Amino acid sequence: MAVQQNKKSPSKRGMHRSHDFLTNPALAVEPTTGEAHLRHHISPNGFYRGRKVVKAKGE
């Protein structure tokens, strides 16, 4: 079983965990409809970067 040689101080422990936090996903706003969507994904209306790329079910 692995055993550490020296105890890690609270400061070093905190530095080690500094990147473990979660971030909110980056949202983009569609210029044509104004809806928010995930970056690099199409909006719920089927628009991507100002162009209609997918037909909606009601169309």
UniProtKB/Swiss-Prot annotation:
User: Any idea which UniProt keywords this protein has?
Assistant: Ribonucleoprotein, Ribosomal protein
Pfam families on file: Ribosomal_L32p
Q: Which GO terms describe its cellular component?
A: large ribosomal subunit
Q: Where is this region: Disordered?
A: 1-22
Superkingdom per UniProt = Bacteria
- What HAMAP family does its record include? Ribosomal_bL32
NCBIfam families linked: rpmF_bact
This one is known as: Large ribosomal subunit protein bL32
